[in-house]
From Swiss-Prot:
Belongs to the actin family. It comes from Branchiostoma floridae. It is an enzyme of class 3 (hydrolase). It catalyses: ATP + H2O = ADP + phosphate + H(+). This is Actin, cytoplasmic.
Amino acid sequence: MEDDVAALVVDNGSGMCKAGFAGDDAPRAVFPSIVGRPRHQGVMVGMGQKDSYVGDEAQSKRGILTLKYPIEHGIVTNWDDMEKIWHHTFYNELRVAPEEHPVLLTEAPLNPKANREKMTQIMFETFNSPAMYVAIQAVLSLYASGRTTGIVLDSGDGVSHTVPIYEGYALPHAILRLDLAGRDLTDYLMKILTERGYSFTTTAEREIVRDIKEKLCYVALDFEQEMSTAASSSSLEKSYELPDGQVITIGNERFRCPESLFQPSFLGMESTGVHETTYNSIMKCDIDIRKDLYANTVLSGGTTMFPGIADRMQKEITALAPSTMKIKIIAPPERKYSVWIGGSILASLSTFQQMWISKQEYDESGPSIVHRKCF
């Protein structure tokens, strides 16, 4: 597909927005889903100060801004800010005219229907898209891994979910959603670093902690054993330089933080961990297809990027499953972007072209068309 008529693929995550052209093998633009507004009164005339900043620009000016994420737990909570992010995506990042390209958007499974209708409405009415489609994130990740059957554990910044898929069909009764993801881990790391005497409180400082999490955290294979190693030696300690040059040291926080994926009680949450959620999801499926799901457990999303997570999942699910069951955890190296890559594959398939919702269909039926055409 040429860029001039190529479909746009926009994966709006709670934390990062990934955007690009169908047929490409990686997104052209990846930027934080943030809208920042100045905390202070502008005093310099002619500075060209704006009343809001989006993405990387908001990130770089974060010291003077209040940062807000318009998507929480995978659901858009602030549509005005969301529109700003889409505007920024089309005009500044991809530099395209949205009225000239079909656009494929993604959403979390089990999202409110109204969320999906509003997305459709904004695409057609604000951006005049010629055609659009909304796809479920986890299904796209499975496409990207080259499978049509498997269970996807998709964990991003705002929401995690397990989606069993058989021969290309998601099994909605067995989809489980867990509102525990990267942002909760960042918040938890902020909290346990405070116990060490480092205080991080503002929205800008949260971004520093997110960076510490991404660079230094890992999942322990055996949590108790790792805790005793950390207590008896300093071999697990790492240092991190803050933007002002101050150096902080972190030890057992490195694996205590992502451990909450497996033990949500650390965060004061009652839910089951990601391993048990995956198992429960498989158990909700027909007995005949479970074997295929165990053997094709695919990890996707940024929160599955912690070193050690695949081995730990293998260990935990093996402990839950029948003893003879073959269990395979697939952790593709590009899993941070596998939702986007799957979208790029889907939107460039010739068989997909009749699936688009056209502007004409929208004008005839209104926003509810999205439930009939996208599933």
